[in-house]
């Protein structure tokens, strides 16, 4: 519903922190990429990112936008991707909400979130970084392209586009080539500290240009 009164906000006046709050509170719901990587020294890393989406099916690609830390430095996920050119986007099922959230803490460099939160690294099919064994779906990716957004200060990000080279899926979560949402139980990110669940689903027929509008 609308009050009829519209406010115009200038990003320059709102500022970086204010715009971040508007983005996470207005772009809803956001799917969560539970990204696993590995450093050149062999240390695994696991972190959730909600600036994430599908890009293309030919070639099959996903995108994850990785913001800088508050001091402007790069996160371990980005450092690992730049070093190895590989990563895995694991699904974010509701039953892993607590562990997923725990992985968002800023652990010291060289510490594996797999070990800290008690998740199981499983061997991937075509990339070196492990997938999360507890997740029913994983997209194994090789780096396709990175795009720097901003000047590298707080709020800047690197848009990472990954080409999917393999998909790992629990057989209970797929039927006739279609993924089953009730088996995936996807978690989504909302504004502030809030998360969401996909509980109510409805279908609409795909319209044609000749079908009457209602």
Question: Could you describe each region identified by the protein language model?
Answer:
Residues 1-214:
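Basic, polyanion-binding surface patches
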């Amino acid at each position: 519903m609308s009050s009829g009164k519209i406010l115009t906000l200038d990003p320059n006046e709102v500022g970086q922190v204010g715009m971040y709050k508007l983005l996470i509170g207005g772009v809803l719901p956001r799917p969560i990429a539970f990204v696993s990587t590995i450093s050149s020294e062999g240390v695994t890393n696991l972190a959730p990112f909600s600036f994430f989406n599908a890009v293309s099916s030919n070639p099959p690609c996903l995108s994850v936008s990785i913001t800088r830390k508050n001091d402007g430095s790069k996160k371990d996920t980005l450092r690992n991707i730049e070093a190895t050119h590989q990563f895995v986007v694991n699904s974010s099922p509701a039953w892993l909400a607590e562990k997923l959230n725990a992985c968002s803490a800023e652990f010291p460099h060289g510490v594996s979130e797999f070990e800290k939160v008690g998740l199981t690294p499983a061997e991937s099919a075509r990339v070196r970084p492990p997938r999360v064994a507890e997740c029913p779906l994983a997209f194994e990716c090789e780096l396709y392209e990175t795009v720097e957004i901003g000047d590298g200060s707080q709020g800047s990000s690197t848009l990472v586009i990954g080409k999917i080279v393999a998909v790992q899926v629990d057989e209970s979560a797929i039927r006739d080539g279609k993924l089953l949402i009730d088996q995936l139980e996807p978690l989504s990110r909302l504004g502030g500290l809030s998360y969401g669940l996909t509980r109510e689903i409805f279908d609409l027929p795909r319209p044609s240009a000749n079908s009457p509008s209602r």
